[in-house]
Amino acid sequence: MSVVYINIFLAFILSFMGLLVYRSHLMSSLLCLEGMMLSLFVMMTITVLTNHFTLASMTPIILLVFAACEAALGLSLLVMISNTYGTDYVQNLNLLQC
């Protein structure tokens, strides 16, 4: 394993640990999820480019599309919760009746 893969894997692990530690606020959780998606995107792109996988060349783009959809949905939930309750606590997600 090269140093680049180890650094990207550590970035993924740190984002995952941040998701576990800072799970009370929705904004912190969304930022940690974006960090995880970014490190996965970079790792998949480097893997496809170094191993010359022609069939898997679209998978990083598909992952980026899913990350954009996840970010849009998360931000819309954040706006709805902050307008309704005034805070961005994750525990308010259980109270939504939509």
UniProtKB/Swiss-Prot annotation:
Q: Which reaction does it catalyse?
A: a ubiquinone + NADH + 5 H(+)(in) = a ubiquinol + NAD(+) + 4 H(+)(out)
Q: What is this protein called?
A: NADH-ubiquinone oxidoreductase chain 4L
The record's subcellular locations are:
Mitochondrion inner membrane
Major place of localization? mitochondrion
GO MF annotation: an example: NADH dehydrogenase (ubiquinone) activity
Task performed by this protein: Core subunit of the mitochondrial membrane respiratory chain NADH dehydrogenase (Complex I) which catalyzes electron transfer from NADH through the respiratory chain, using ubiquinone as an electron acceptor. Part of the enzyme membrane arm which is embedded in the lipid bilayer and involved in proton translocation.
Family, according to the entry, reads as follows: Belongs to the complex I subunit 4L family.
Complex and partners: Core subunit of respiratory chain NADH dehydrogenase (Complex I) which is composed of 45 different subunits.
